[in-house]
């Protein structure tokens, strides 16, 4: 099997397509015609990374010589590389472009590359190399928001807020967007503290709402998860920028009031049912399990499973 295109072969293609160019021991000259001597790149050589699906990843941030390359030369070199990858039977190209090298986006787009996603300091473009429509997976399809229903069982009070920047101020649970690699329960605890000053502990997941074409998610789909939290402090010190009001409200009152959203009303009634009949009837508890990827773990949320069913001891 032929090896993925290395930076040395990439430079050779650029040289063939753009005119006489650098061989080993030369680099692009900055602000001058021609080339100047430079030690071989050696350890800085970079091959496009071949993934298990036959795709090639090219990370321009690792190719220092591109800082002195113009867009036209890059386009010709990329075109030659794409032709080679097609001849090798590769499935796709993933082109990672740092924001400061964005001048290479238009040349790539002219060759058929499309945006896949962008981060704060880079963008990723893709090109499907096989026949037929692209089978590459899309980027993240959902935004994840998490709220905390902080319920004090001793007083039957629940913590609620009114957002400052809403057209209609209604009672709701404090919450916000989950951060990258942040567990659902941790998001709920963090958001509650940031908005209200109340410290709490994650107990369970109560509900999951899925909404498509959500204006608050840039028109994408949105997952809104409400967690049951147990309070460890009770003095409210709410964020004046985010919240108009914040208080401990009787759970019965929240379940009956019309001054709330449908989801808040439904979860309040769910909590009331759990308080009276047992939280085991409403809680989705969490357990950490090993992932199929070595060294990684995940959190699984489900109704409580008796220990003998977890171990299957004594189960026929």
UniProtKB/Swiss-Prot annotation:
Detected in liver, kidney and esophagus (at protein level). Ubiquitous. InterPro entries: NUDIX_hydrolase-like_dom_sf, Nudix_hydrolase6-like, NUDIX_hydrolase_CS, NUDIX_hydrolase_dom, Pre-Nudix. One of its GO terms (biological process) is negative regulation of cell cycle. Transmembrane segments: none annotated. Keywords: Cytoplasm, Hydrolase, Mitochondrion, Nucleus. It is an enzyme of class 3 (hydrolase). Its EC number is 3.6.1.-. GO terms for molecular function: ADP-ribose diphosphatase activity; NAD binding; NADH pyrophosphatase activity. It is found in: Cytoplasm; Nucleus; Mitochondrion. One of its GO terms (cellular component) is nucleus. A motif (Nudix box) lies at residues 176-197. The keyword Cytoplasm applies. Residues 141-273 form the Nudix hydrolase domain. It comes from the Eukaryota. May contribute to the regulation of cell proliferation. Belongs to the Nudix hydrolase family. Monomer and homodimer. This protein is coded from a FGF2 (BFGF) gene antisense transcript. This is Nucleoside diphosphate-linked moiety X motif 6. It comes from Homo sapiens. The gene is NUDT6.
